[in-house]
Amino acid sequence: MVIDLQTAFESEPPTLDFIWPGFLAGTVGALVAPGATGKSFWALEAAMSIACSSAGGDLVGLNPTHTGRVIYLAGEDPPAALVCRVHAIGKHLDRQAREIIMENLTLEPIMGQRMNVMDSRHLARIIDFCGDARLIVLDTLSRIHCLDENSNGDMARLVGTLEYVASNTGAAILYLHHVSKGSAREFQTDQQQAARGASALIDNARWCGFVAKMTEKESECLSDLPDDRKPIGNDRRGHFVRFGVSKQNYDATPLDRWYQRRSGGVLLPVKLFEATQESSRKVWRGCA
């Protein structure tokens, strides 16, 4: 379709259809994190937020404007593990939210099925299966192709194929991906360049979010206690993760937000405060 420049100049532009703030329908986005950080839990809870038209289903606080059908293709975990996650999340949902999510969310385990989106037959089945979806989650990217992850040419082809799915379904495609060993070692997993493999994976995506573990320094600077402001500390920092956006093409980048890991691994938003030293009660500035 050729853009009508006269209409574009003279008429009000269309309202962009965001899946959640900054993530545009019909585009490809990424969520990156080290292994065992909580990205699959965050993505599953986000999928439920988009699938549920009731406010009670938005556990991660995305505040989506529109909701709809969501397809979650889980390539890393067996069915039993997925059931445990759903059960843990369900404890924080009311009955109405659970019923709407059951109607609109399809959670499909694909571990061991050797799905390959670069195979034309597999690709056609994916498009047919996801035809009326608003969001498609691919967990994780490495489970759905056989290309060279370090080749910019191969990864550009892969993202282009995901864009083909997005174009044919109208859905946003969110793929989950791991970060490189170097970025994890240097605590730089919140950077746009942190993703493992070729730069085209993120350069060609239109949105990229991250989930990062709380660092030791952050645990000394932050408190989850509004009154005495005692630091979270190294012993408890494993219960907190930070979500943020490292790339956003269509809107202003939002502020990072913190989540606390609850029973079963569920992530729930938490408000953190600047910690104070117990001895002098002065505010620590180490996180600035």
Question: What function would you assign to each model-found segment?
Answer:
Residues 50-53, 89-92, 140, 144-147, ...:
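Conserved, well-folded catalytic cores of nucleic-acid-processing
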Residues 1-19:
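N-terminal pre-Walker A segment at the start of P-loop NTPase domains
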Residues 30-32, 36, 41, 155-265:
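Phosphate-binding/switch region of NTP-binding enzymes
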Residues 19-96:
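Walker A/P-loop NTP-binding active-site region of P-loop NTPases
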Residues 15, 65-153, 157, 164:
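Conserved inter-motif catalytic segment of the P-loop NTP-binding fold
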Residues 248-288:
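Conserved alpha/beta core segments of nucleic-acid transaction machinery
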Residues 26, 68, 131-132, 169, ...:
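Structured loop/turn residues at beta-strand edges in well-structured enzyme cores
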Residues 10-15, 117, 189-192:
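Short gly/ser/thr-rich secondary-structure transition/capping motifs
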